[in-house]
Regions:
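Membrane-embedded and interfacial regions of multi-pass energy-transducing membrane proteins
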Residues: 1-347
């Protein structure tokens, strides 16, 4: 039987929650893709067709758009749990695969945000393609031309439909590595203090799945447009620009980084490095940095300071990139880098 730590808490339930939500997204996305038309003249009206004429089309659309937020909430909580308890020191390959899944999920979410072809979708695609112009030769391949057009939507649709296959494969490897190395336990409890996965943790995961299902049904039933942008309900018009082009809330942290760096290429590199540095935790940590936050007082407070800075970046991401907000964003970036370096070195 698969041995699991006896000291697991509810933080260990986020893995199965995020996995179940990802597969829910794959199922609803497949059903929606059967009726979607990847063309700039038909994409918006195909979404309206799904709403009004496809049986349970509005339900599929609402579930697919609403579950995206819980996916990133559970994935980020799952990732922060591994950092807090020092899992990168014991199951490094598992964490590396998890970071790969996180990056692929970000790409899928961005591609999916463009497909409804509302006003915010169009200008969001324009901003990101301009950002990718810092890499030579990428923009003509992504756009299929010199600007965002029908080939762009077709490419985004194909990539958005193909990447979930890569995600499911990465999740399989993630679980295989986990079963080979076993889950990490809270530091101080010992590695031999373990119990069988069945039946104790099966019941625990089942309770977590039922709780997540209740929360998801509540959001789909009562708060489906709570996190939506009103501008994205309007059809694309190149003559109309939203007052502020804002991505989904789970991208606001990275959007605040881009607005804080004046150079386009440098901002892109900082944003990529901001994510990739998570892969270096297992190798770059000093001996004192390998300990989890529960046994290291300095890392304990550093982790909470980093968490507060991330919440602050979400607020910064919705502000206009002007005046004092640029300075605030640079201050956040400095604090965040200091926290990450301090966490690696164990102070």
């Amino acid at each position: 039987m698969y041995p699991c730590p006896k000291s697991t808490s509810n933080h260990w339930n986020m893995g199965i929650l995020s996995g179940s939500m990802v597969y829910t997204q794959v199922l609803t996305g497949t059903l929606l893709g059967l009726h979607y038309t990847p063309d700039i003249y038909s994409a918006y009206y195909s979404v309206i067709h799904i709403y009004r004429e496809v049986y349970y089309g509005s339900l599929y659309r609402y579930v697919h758009s609403s579950v995206a937020s819980p996916v990133f909430t559970t994935v980020c909580t799952h990732l922060s749990r591994g950092i807090f308890h020092g899992s990168y020191a014991y199951v490094y390959s598992v964490m590396w695969m998890g970071i790969a899944v996180f990056l692929v999920l970000m790409a899928i979410a961005y591609m999916g945000y463009v497909l409804p072809w509302g006003s915010m979708s169009y200008w969001g695609a324009t901003v990101i393609t301009n950002l990718l112009s810092s890499i030579p030769g990428v923009v003509p391949w992504v756009c299929g031309g010199f600007h965002v057009s029908s080939p762009t939507v077709s490419r985004y649709y194909i990539i958005h439909s193909t990447l979930p296959v890569l995600t499911t494969g990465s999740l399989v490897f993630h679980v295989l590595y986990l079963h080979r190395l076993s889950s990490s336990s809270n530091p101080g409890y010992g590695t031999n203090n373990r119990i069988h996965f069945y039946t104790w943790l099966v019941h625990k995961d089942t309770l977590a799945l039922v709780s997540g299902l209740v929360v998801t049904i509540t959001q789909v039933s009562y708060g489906v447009i709570m996190l939506a942008h009103p501008d994205n309900t309007l059809e694309v018009s190149v003559l109309y620009t939203p007052l502020h082009i804002v991505p989904e809330w789970y991208f606001l942290e990275f959007y605040s980084i881009l607005k804080s760096i004046p150079g386009r290429s440098s901002g892109f590199l900082v944003m990529i490095s901001y994510i990739y540095v998570l892969n270096t935790y297992g190798e770059a940590c000093t001996p004192s940095g390998l300990a989890g936050c529960t046994v290291h007082t300095g890392k304990y407070y550093t982790w909470y300071l980093l968490s507060v800075s991330v919440l602050y970046s979400l607020w910064m991401g919705v502000q206009l990139p002007q005046g004092e907000y640029i300075s605030y964003g640079r201050g956040y970036l400095m604090v965040s880098i200091w926290c990450r370096v301090g966490y690696i070195n164990g102070f």
